[in-house]
Amino acid sequence: MAEQQPRPILITGAGRRIGLALAHHFLQQRQPVIVSYRTPYPAIDGLREAGALCLQADFSSDDGILTFAEAVKSHTDGLRAIIHNASDWMAEKPGVPLSTVINRMMQIHVHAPYLLNHALEALLRGHGHAASDIIHITDYVVERGSDKHIAYAASKAALDNMTRSFARKLAPEVKVNAIAPSLIMFNEGDDEAYRQQALDKSLMKIAPGEKEISDLIDYLFTSRYVTGRSFAVDGGRPLR
């Protein structure tokens, strides 16, 4: 009998930073990976060379989201997990209509996960008890809000709430959890003053790197019991 191939993990927004690191993490485990990307960063070529199936996607419209879902279904009839990492960042500022800001934030952080979870549900089901996972990457601002990024915080809070709703809908076959990170890694252009200021906002005073997220996801994938929960990865920042 031929050995059964593992089901792919789908990661949205894997062109850089945490999404990119997660894709390489699972590829190193010989786990098939499907990624979405919006911008063709050079790192996408590296993912292809490492064995990932890389699909360009436009989540700025519902049609674009559903077209991507159909593309995924054309390549596989089962998924091990969906990691909703695709994200956008837009502040309320003069000259930009508020409706533009809220619609853009809700489109990427709410419409995309909502539609994809429904469209790809059948690919996650049918593999046994707690055999599949959905991970929503939210943000620590879900807990405290943001006066400068109100729409962003609201959209991530909606995604956090959907975690519990989908956990109820998809149990016991599929576990659904959220991860709410604060500072995980710096950008190359961040100067020393900014870095120190950012580090001082948490109790642990480090930028832990992407491994902190991949280790947590490994645990959640292994668990057969944990679902409907949000895990803060913030170094104790709310306690400062």
Curated annotation (Swiss-Prot):
One Pfam family named in its UniProt record: adh_short_C2
The protein's Enzyme Commission number: 1.5.1.50, 1.5.1.3
Keywords: NADP, One-carbon metabolism, Oxidoreductase
Chain segments annotated as coiled-coil in the UniProt record: none
PROSITE patterns (alphabetical): ADH_SHORT
Location of the active site: Y152 (proton acceptor)
GO biological process, one term: one-carbon metabolic process
GO MF entry, a single one: dihydrofolate reductase activity
Keyword NADP attributed: yes
KW Oxidoreductase (keyword) present: yes
Catalysis performed (reactions): (6S)-5,6,7,8-tetrahydrofolate + NADP(+) = 7,8-dihydrofolate + NADPH + H(+); 7,8-dihydromonapterin + NADPH + H(+) = 5,6,7,8-tetrahydromonapterin + NADP(+)
Function: Catalyzes the reduction of dihydromonapterin to tetrahydromonapterin. Also has lower activity with dihydrofolate.
Similarity-based family: Belongs to the short-chain dehydrogenases/reductases (SDR) family. FolM subfamily.
The name this protein goes by in its record: Dihydromonapterin reductase
UniProt organism field: Klebsiella pneumoniae subsp. pneumoniae (strain ATCC 700721 / MGH 78578)
Lineage of the organism: Bacteria, Pseudomonadati, Pseudomonadota, Gammaproteobacteria, Enterobacterales
